[in-house]
Amino acid sequence: MKAPMKKLLIALSCCLAGMSPARAHAFLDHADPKVGSTVKVSPTEIKIWFTEGVILPFSDLKVLDASGKEVQKNDKHLDPAHPDVLIVSVPPLKPGKYKVSWRVTAVDTHVTHGFFPFEVSP
């Protein structure tokens, strides 16, 4: 390889090595209650932080009890200051196991989905 080309490739490699990858799609970052956690007091809402903003009309967040019945209220919304945080209220939850199921369309228009458990155990 000729010296000028080799220097160019080395310089380009150094530049690219310092770049961080762009985030793509809205993947679950963290949640409240925490994924897989046991809480002593029923939460009043479920909050999920995603790795990028989501489009509310094309996103869903459900909370299911152990029998598979939906228990969330009909007030799904985004945090006004953080379009990557999806929130839904829940009534006082009885002790037991619950599953949070989500399906979101990210601002990049890609759809992701998943679920996680948590438990209420006073």
State where each predicted segment sits.
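Short N-terminal segments immediately surrounding and downstream of signal-peptide cleavage
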Residues: 25-43
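Short, exposed beta-strand-loop hairpins at the edges of beta-sheets
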Residues: 90, 94, 101-117
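Short, surface-exposed alpha-helix to beta-strand junction/turn motifs within ectodomains of secreted
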Residues: 46-47, 52-74
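Bacterial N-terminal signal peptides
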Residues: 10-18
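Bacterial N-terminal signal peptides that target proteins for export
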Residues: 1-9
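Sec/Tat signal peptide C-region and signal peptidase I cleavage site
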Residues: 19-24
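Extracellular Ig-like/FN3 beta-sandwich strand-entry sites
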Residues: 43, 95-97
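Extended, polar beta-sheet/loop recognition surfaces of beta-rich domains
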Residues: 39-41, 45-52, 109-122
